[in-house]
Amino acid sequence: MTNIRKTHPLIKIVNHSFIDLPTPSNISAWWNFGSLLGLCLITQILTGLFLAMHYTSDTTTAFSSVTHICRDVNYGWLIRYIHANGASMFFICLYLHVGRGLYYGSYTYFETWNIGVILLFTIMATAFMGYVLPWGQMSFWGATVITNLLSAIPYIGTNLVEWIWGGFSVDKATLTRFFAFHFILPFIITALVMIHLLFLHETGSNNPSGLISDSDKIPFHPYFTIKDILGALLLILTLMLLVLFSPDLLGDPDNYTPANPLNTPPHIKPEWYFLFAYAILRSIPNKLGGVLALVFSILILMLFPILHTSKQRGMMFRPLSQCLFWILAADLFTLTWIGGQPVEHPFIIIGQTASILYFTIILIILPLVSMLENKLLKW
């Protein structure tokens, strides 16, 4: 009798994706983040579901319902903090996953890469809407500032903002619809993840050398299931250390003050994982220009396959490109730091310099250096 996992219509899909999947034998720990992102997504959906059972999306009771979850619900504080810090872990894994893709040239798989960028946008939208739900000061003012950016769109901007708000300011209608979207989007993300995997399994995984690895593939199970379990344990350990010892480390103290439309916080800033984009937005004095720079700072990822001028796929054997990659990484850390600082000297000029450097490296320097490395190959 043939093995059921190879014949059953449903089980064989799982088999081809996670058990008998031919995998390059030399993939490093940088390839662990895909499975870790899957784990983060499942954790966020489950904790979010339990939070939604007790949360009320009304401006008068939203803040107190979160307090009620933390104080009165069995392990409510744990569920809430796993969900809040789980989002941070999600973004850490996400940025490392994207960084791996850039370093090893995984963006040459067009479909997989583009679906991945769409996923990044969707996850960012979901996280933003989730941050509004506790209805603290930073929730309210963050929602006001970010949604207000859409008013920079010529002609339809103001109408668009009022349509999204459901009125003339961020209020009950806004909170209710944000909760509805925050609930539905993770399921859309799950569907996109399946498409992402579908396209990936059409081509097979990339590997650190960037060479075709068809002649040296091994089954995913048990080799990489064990490796992924190790990664998962380390992720869970990090998350639980964060949740149980310093759950508010990455949050904003202002969000423990109920939303007050009459009192603006001194420094309005988003969660840490949006600070780099926020710094790019603030570095341009013009409103529409800032919004375009903000969108393009993420959308630029879609240009990488077009901007790839090297004859080699990854950066493993390209020291000049490696240097540029790490300068870009340092630049993103600088932007993240600047995004959390007040708008004053010297932070303004540092932010503007870092923003210019970000776009210059990606659009100009990296393609030129790749072409130079092609020339050096002939020597």
From Swiss-Prot:
Component of the ubiquinol-cytochrome c reductase complex (complex III or cytochrome b-c1 complex) that is part of the mitochondrial respiratory chain. The b-c1 complex mediates electron transfer from ubiquinol to cytochrome c. Contributes to the generation of a proton gradient across the mitochondrial membrane that is then used for ATP synthesis. CDD domains: cytochrome_b_C (cd00290), Cytochrome_b_N (cd00284). A ubiquinone binds at H201. Its main location: mitochondrion. Heme b b566 binds at H97, H196. Binds 2 heme b groups non-covalently. Heme 1 (or BL or b562) is low-potential and absorbs at about 562 nm, and heme 2 (or BH or b566) is high-potential and absorbs at about 566 nm. SUPFAM superfamilies: a domain/subunit of cytochrome bc1 complex (Ubiquinol-cytochrome c reductase), Transmembrane di-heme cytochromes. It is a multi-pass membrane protein. This is Cytochrome b. Coiled coil: none annotated. It is found in: Mitochondrion inner membrane. Keywords: Electron transport, Heme, Iron, Membrane, Metal-binding, Mitochondrion, Mitochondrion inner membrane, Respiratory chain, Transmembrane, Transmembrane helix, Transport, Ubiquinone. Heme b b562 binds at H83, H182. InterPro entries: Cyt_b/b6_C, Cyt_b/b6_C_sf, Cyt_b/b6_N, Cytb/b6-like_sf, Cytochrome_b, Cytochrome_b_C_euk/bac, Cytochrome_b_N_euk/bac, Di-haem_cyt_TM. GO terms for biological process: mitochondrial electron transport, ubiquinol to cytochrome c. One of its GO terms (molecular function) is metal ion binding. The gene is MT-CYB. The chain crosses the membrane at residues 33-53, 77-98, 113-133, 178-198, 226-246, 288-308, 320-340, 347-367. Belongs to the cytochrome b family. Its cofactor is heme b. It holds the Pfam family Cytochrom_B_C.
